[in-house]
Amino acid sequence: MKDTFVEKVDDFVKQHDVLKEHSTIVVGVSGGPDSLALLYYLLEKRAAKQFEIVVAHVDHMFRGDESHEDLQFVQDLCKGLGVICETIRINVSQYQQQYGMNAQVAARECRYAFLERIMKKYDARYVALGHHGDDQVETILMRLVRGSTPKGYAGIAVKRPFHNGYLIRPLLGVTKEEIVDYCNKLKIIPRIDPSNKKEVYTRNRLRKYVLPHLKEENPQVHEKFQKFSMQMQEDEAYLQELAFEKMNKVITKKSDKQISLSIPAFESMSMPLQRRGIQLILNYLYEYKIPSSLSSIHIDKVIEFFKRTQPSGSLDFPGDLKIVRAYEECSFGFKQEIVSPFLQDLSVPGTITLSNGDKLVTEVSEDIPSDMNETVFVAKYNDISYPLRIRSRENGDRMSIQGMNGTKKIKAIFIEAKVPREKREEWPVVCDASGNVIWLPLLKRSAFAISKETAKKDKYMIIHYKSKESSGRIMK
């Protein structure tokens, strides 16, 4: 007769395509009943499935000698079982203080970094963790109570990408009670973490006071929550694809540290896609290392920020992320140091690279470019005094405007073009050797410029503005 626990896990693993044969699996083992049940299950399948098993254990050093004894327990167990064991002691409290995060997040980051390292070392395809069905119920309830993103409400994923393989949770189809029964049957005596009973933690209170009532209503409640989780994940994957597609049409500029979007185009999207669109931007900029202090409230703040009647403003997010609105455009980017005034000579022909990576390239030609757009400036060579100088703006700057009488303040040009204030200090101002402002790239040409219509055969000085920024596609 088949063991009920093993049979249920087998069915779950097969249903969700969790494991492939001939694989190396790193098993996270704390010494508690959940991870030990997972280890013994995989060992039972090792010969038939041709698995290679590596155990990984992290001592977070939260409980002094007691947590060190957990490490020794796992080492001794693996020695007796003939299983490779990799362990590490990490002062998580120190890491927590250094990076300003709560203890649970700090422990998770340290643990996952170690698991990734062991995965690389053994070229493993999977990292297996012992989360079970009751954990799934508690997680979903906790996120509903605290608030989360739609992806968060889906709970714990059965299988997700991790390093060059997958992080898997084969025990999500069984309950804690079934795990304890399996351990008792095999006469496994696990280590017990006393913090799992402390009611200071929300999860422990839900486990003690809420979960028993749910199980009274339906003993298989974990299966219902798991089904809910899978449906949420499937729906979320579809909506994420839609949001990704829409956002690539909304984004106007993108670099490694900054993304800009059109607010009217963004607001034309449905609200579910708006929320996911903001999440995509945050994932990209934070490189999927979202600060623990960031929550769904912040996404709602961005959406409310767009609805304000004021044409400009800013929001400060964790990790020095700043969101700046300027009229109908909004930029998400990390705070930069104050831009110092700059001055550079530009030879003709020649090239200079600006602080933002963009370039100004000059040439001399008897022919003018076929495309005379805002990235090109053309003047008669002999009308300009050399060398050209590229500098930051100065108080009182004015320039003559092509096709207009008199001069105009550069400040007024920036305001009319709705250039954000923080961008104005780094905007290049092109002057001749006499100090005349001859071009404000992308914005205005001076009276020194010639148009395509008035151009005749002559010797011309041409300046090209070349941006390094890619178009606005968000990397997946």
From Swiss-Prot:
**Record's protein name:** tRNA(Ile)-lysidine synthase
* Natural source organism: Bacillus cereus (strain ZK / E33L)
Free-text comment on this protein's domains from its UniProt entry: The N-terminal region contains the highly conserved SGGXDS motif, predicted to be a P-loop motif involved in ATP binding.
| EC number(s) reported in the record | 6.3.4.19
Q: Which gene encodes it?
A: tilS
Sorted UniProt keywords: ATP-binding, Cytoplasm, Ligase, Nucleotide-binding, tRNA processing
The UniProt entry, under SMART domains, shows: TilS_C
- Give the family per the record: Belongs to the tRNA(Ile)-lysidine synthase family.
Please list the reactions this protein catalyses: cytidine(34) in tRNA(Ile2) + L-lysine + ATP = lysidine(34) in tRNA(Ile2) + AMP + diphosphate + H(+)
